[in-house]
């Protein structure tokens, strides 16, 4: 399958680089950098809302993935309407709608948020008022009700409470189904992982799954430990998703190029290996600084990039020493 450079790879490269510079601060001083607003975070990471075009990749005749600024968007288009998974930013919505129109779709009928983070759900601010039915796992909607801080270690983002019209109007606890465009779409929640409100969206007819940021294919994953995410949970969530699919399933990550069953399997093996080595160090009394200076990710750094953010947030999730919740 064709793969292309994903603009969010730059985001993770910059974020991880900033994170390494701040590791000591995160451990021994103020745990959260001064939170930025959307203008600050977009400037810090070089996001170009005006200049970034939407790139479309076909999965099946009725399922596509849109790449732009923010999380990958899955688009189901057919006789029943348009269902999307994640919606990026309102600044991108005209181009997102145009891309959907080129696929033969009209207005977005349903938008599923894989979780509540701004780069996957801020598009709600445009879609909700336009009449789109917004959907999420119940914990994600709960997070959207109030102001949140997302600690990315080197930087932090101040995510404001969503207005009423941008909140999910349909929520679920563990599972729900759509029957749309000739296929069954399963929404499944397997507990805390990247956040406490993650959703795997499985398109049964297309044999594809969108995992949101539980599966990051642009670098190491970010564990939002400050808001209840855990490294153990990411591994569990991915394993339970793997049990729902087969070896020919297309796997859509939250960021990075489209992947497959083997890619997700390798991701699970990598995180399990890192987690096990980290736990061995923790049980021997290792500090965060010990973990950060170790070589437990050396086998993966060449392809995944800087591990600092994963190690920091993973350490705190495994030791339950999260200092910024």
Sequence positions of predicted segments:
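Bacterial N-terminal signal peptides that target proteins for export
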Residues: 1-11
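Accessory terminal helices/loops
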Residues: 15, 19-22, 27-45, 243-247, ...
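Zn-dependent metallo-beta-lactamase
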Residues: 23-80
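Conserved beta-strand hairpin/beta-sheet module of binuclear metal-dependent hydrolase folds
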Residues: 55-99, 201-203, 208-213
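Metallo-beta-lactamase
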Residues: 58, 81-82, 89-91, 141-193, 204-205, 238, ...
């Amino acid at each position: 399958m064709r793969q292309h450079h994903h603009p969010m790879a730059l985001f993770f490269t910059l974020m991880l680089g900033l994170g390494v510079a701040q590791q000591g601060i995160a451990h021994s001083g103020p745990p959260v950098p001064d939170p930025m607003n959307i203008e600050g975070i977009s400037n810090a990471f070089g996001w170009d809302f005006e200049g970034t075009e939407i790139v479309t990749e076909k999965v099946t005749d009725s399922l596509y993935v849109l790449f732009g600024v923010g999380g990958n968007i899955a688009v189901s288009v057919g006789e029943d309407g348009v269902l999307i998974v994640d919606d990026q930013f309102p600044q991108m919505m005209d181009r997102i709608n145009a891309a959907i129109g080129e696929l033969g779709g009209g207005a977005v009928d349903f938008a599923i948020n894989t979780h509540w983070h701004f780069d996957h759900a801020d598009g709600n601010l445009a879609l909700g008022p336009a009449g789109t039915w917004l959907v999420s796992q119940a914990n994600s909607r709960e997070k959207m009700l109030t102001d949140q801080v997302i600690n990315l270690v080197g930087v932090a983002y101040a995510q404001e409470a969503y207005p009423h019209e941008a909140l999910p109007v349909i929520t679920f606890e563990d599972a729900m189904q759509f029957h749309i465009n000739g296929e069954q779409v399963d929404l499944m929640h397997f507990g805390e992982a990247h956040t406490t409100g993650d959703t795997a969206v499985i398109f049964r007819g297309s044999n594809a799954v969108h995992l949101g940021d539980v599966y990051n294919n642009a670098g190491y994953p970010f564990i939002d430990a400050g808001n209840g995410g855990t490294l153990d949970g990411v591994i569990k969530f991915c394993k339970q998703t793997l049990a729902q699919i087969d070896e020919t399933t297309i796997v859509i990550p939250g960021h990075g190029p489209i992947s497959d069953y083997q890619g997700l399997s390798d991701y699970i093996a990598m995180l399990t290996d890192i987690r096990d080595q980290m736990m061995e160090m923790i049980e021997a009394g290792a500090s965060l600084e010990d973990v950060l200076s170790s070589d437990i990710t050396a086998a993966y750094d060449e392809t995944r990039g800087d591990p600092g953010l994963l190690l920091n947030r993973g350490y705190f999730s495994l030791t339950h020493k999260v200092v910024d919740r």
